[in-house]
Amino acid sequence: FPTRRSSDLKVTGYRRSLSLDEAVSSVSFNSGGVNYKREYFATNPDNVLVLRLTADKQKSITMNMGLDLMRQADLSVEDNQLVFTGKVDFPLHGPGGVCFEGRIAVLADNGEVKMEQSGVGIKEADAVTLIVDVRTDYKSPDYKTLCADGVKKAAAKSYDE
């Protein structure tokens, strides 16, 4: 989806906050006459990260997102989730390393989501929720199933749950 570059947008009223009671970090700002809010938290027992972007005007969220990973990873789309898999080697410490898998579910309130291997496009959404889970084989050889199940279970809940 075509979007404006973030460098072209003027941002005012930028504010960061942290609620220790609710364990939620948030950022709010105004751009183009629209008030936006981003909220972030890690949930237990779901063991996922949740990021939510909302706007005070309908159909105000249009954007493209991609991954810029520090490690070599294979990217794919599976079950409407962006999936990245790979292995991290530690050559200084001998052979071995850990295999990893990460999944990102993108849930848009209204609007359209276009998911491709290169990233995700969101068009005219009222709100967007990202659910992120990353697992390694360090503790469990079944890390891929745990990762997929974690995102799937969390995505089945409403944001308020």
Predicted regions and their residues:
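Aromatic-residue-lined binding/catalytic grooves and analogous aromatic/hydrophobic interfacial grooves
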Residues: 4-161
